[in-house]
Amino acid sequence: MLVLTTETIPGKGIKEVKGLVKGSTVRCKNIGKDIASSFKNLVGGEMNSYTEILTEARQIAIGRMVDEAESLGANAIIEMRLVSSSLAAGAAEMVAYGTAVIYEDA
């Protein structure tokens, strides 16, 4: 599955637009790692546990979006975007969305 943030696929033509596809996940912090990150917040530096959570959330959301596109028979997703939001204390949502298409050689 080709996943692009662009509107077009260089050297290819869009044969059919399948529609909007999306994937999301809500991730919570681990209390032990959260305490360690709180100390890091005091002295500065990267909060590795939060970076890991966001990386995992992106991968899951994109994977779910790709699964939805494949179920529609698409072979690419164009105009893919990622959005994150804080839902509650210690929880964050990651959403991936884009347009599922079938492309062919131009």
Curated annotation (Swiss-Prot):
Highest rank taxon of the organism: Bacteria
Pfam families linked to this entry: YbjQ_1
The family this protein is said to belong to: Belongs to the UPF0145 family.
Protein name (Swiss-Prot/TrEMBL): UPF0145 protein CPE0882
Organism: Clostridium perfringens (strain 13 / Type A)
